């Protein structure tokens, strides 16, 4: 590939992100009412949309001079829609979207800085109420905050308490204990596998790989935002990839077909009772409650595992997802009024009640609700997973390139390639690093 072609590709990826929001702002009508368009990516199921409708109605009642038009965007179509509508330059006033979008849009000079909201939160104590400083630091680039966090999306490992008890095992806390427990509980003859995880070339595969990278002492960026995936972090990242994929290739404790699994495929097998350990989203809690309530009391959530990096590496990948405002919105101040109202402790409780576990508040003060206290798995996720959840870029932040690395599934491919058998862990890591490196040159 020539240098000119490579630059064109990179610009098409980074520069082509803006097109999702080709809907257009509504502005101010003849009656002086500000009409705002609000695009959502992860609040679009019928249940969540109904709950959101009530939240938006409450805002409009409290702010009669502002109306909100909610427009859902299918998560499966987000990236194609970005590229298809890149030339539209007609974005909504407000959006909630994928984790790194504010930085990518800021690189296009399309984002309104959110420094004033961060300053407000700092002055009123709300910033200290957020679980992790990386929830907002991730949106800091070139001296400005380009988004603010509103939601946390976690990646727990679930386990069957009854199957471990039958083998005389305690819930594992280390890599070694986890591997041994997955092997001991694997009984495909009885329709139960030791572990199930999504190894298809989908975004979810890299989420769990990221957790093991942290636990091995690896990562993608260093604290200064430099790419280290295949350099100083190479050995740790290879070790993490080997540990994860060995479950399928060496120990053979996973069901057939995980190389084609996306999120719901692996979670479905666990919800059906066909695996001792299941890698999933927080939404697994809701699925257990709805689809197999008899299994609920037999399921627990693991502590974040300790790997080669020791206690300091007990971290798990998660997403602090953003809200942001279009730079050219005619209703920027009204949009910020909405965001400041929307992101308040307790405000989104109707959403959290609708799909337990799928969405998590970012505020520490939201954890003591009756909703959490009355649900054992929510409490376990809260104490065992949420405090250890951090961003993909950790310990770095503020790199728009991370949106491309995540969006193009650059470290999901290694998981799939090793499970399928087309590459060794070392080659898969180095090939991925070389693709990432093109974004930083």
Report residues per predicted region:
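Glycine-centered hinge/linker elements that transmit conformational signals in sensory
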Residues: 182-184, 226-258
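Extracytoplasmic/periplasmic solute-binding protein
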Residues: 141-150, 155, 179-229, 266, ...
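C-terminal lobe and pocket-closing loops
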Residues: 119, 283-295, 308-410
């Amino acid at each position: 590939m020539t240098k000119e072609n490579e630059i064109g590709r990179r610009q098409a990826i980074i520069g082509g992100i803006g097109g999702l929001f080709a809907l257009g702002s509504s502005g101010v009508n003849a009656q002086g009412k500000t009409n705002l368009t609000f695009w959502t990516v992860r609040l679009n199921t019928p249940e969540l949309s109904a709950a959101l409708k009530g939240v938006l109605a409450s805002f409009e009642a409290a702010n009669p001079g502002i109306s909100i038009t909610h427009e859902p965007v299918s998560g499966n179509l987000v990236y194609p829609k970005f590229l298809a509508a890149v030339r539209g330059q007609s974005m909504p006033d407000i959006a909630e979207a994928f984790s790194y979008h504010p930085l990518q849009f800021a690189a296009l000079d399309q984002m309104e800085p959110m420094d004033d909201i961060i300053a407000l939160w700092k002055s009123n104590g709300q910033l200290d109420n957020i679980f992790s400083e990386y929830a907002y630091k991730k949106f800091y680039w070139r001296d400005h905050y380009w988004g603010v966090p509103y939601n946390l999306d976690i990646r727990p490992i679930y386990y069957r308490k009854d199957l471990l008890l039958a083998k005389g095992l305690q819930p594992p806390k280390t890599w070694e204990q986890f591997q041994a427990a997955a092997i001991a509980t694997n009984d495909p003859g009885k329709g139960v596998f030791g572990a199930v995880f999504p190894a298809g070339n989908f975004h979810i595969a890299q989420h769990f790989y990221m957790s093991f990278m942290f636990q091995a002492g690896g990562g993608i960026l260093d604290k200064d935002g430099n790419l280290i995936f295949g350099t100083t972090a190479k050995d740790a990242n290879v070790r993490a990839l080997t540990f994860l994929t060995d479950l399928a290739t060496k120990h053979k404790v996973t069901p057939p077909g995980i190389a084609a699994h996306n999120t719901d495929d692996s979670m479905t097998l666990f919800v059906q009772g066909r695996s001792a350990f299941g890698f999933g989203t927080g939404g697994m809690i809701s699925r257990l409650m709805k689809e197999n309530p008899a299994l609920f009391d037999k399921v627990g959530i693991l502590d974040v595992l300790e790997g080669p990096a020791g206690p300091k590496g007990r971290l798990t990948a998660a997403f602090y997802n953003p809200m942001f405002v279009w730079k050219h919105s005619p209703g920027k101040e009204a949009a910020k009024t909405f965001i400041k109202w929307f992101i308040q402790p307790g405000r989104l409780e109707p959403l959290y009640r609708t799909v337990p576990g799928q969405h998590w508040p970012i505020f520490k003060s939201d954890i003591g609700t009756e909703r959490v206290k009355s649900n054992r798995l929510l409490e376990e996720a809260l104490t065992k997973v949420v405090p250890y959840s951090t961003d993909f870029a950790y310990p770095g932040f503020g790199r728009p390139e991370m949106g491309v690395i995540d969006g193009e599934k650059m470290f999901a491919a290694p998981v799939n390639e090793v499970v399928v058998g087309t590459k060794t862990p070392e080659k898969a890591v180095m090939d991925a690093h070389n693709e990432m490196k093109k974004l930083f040159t």
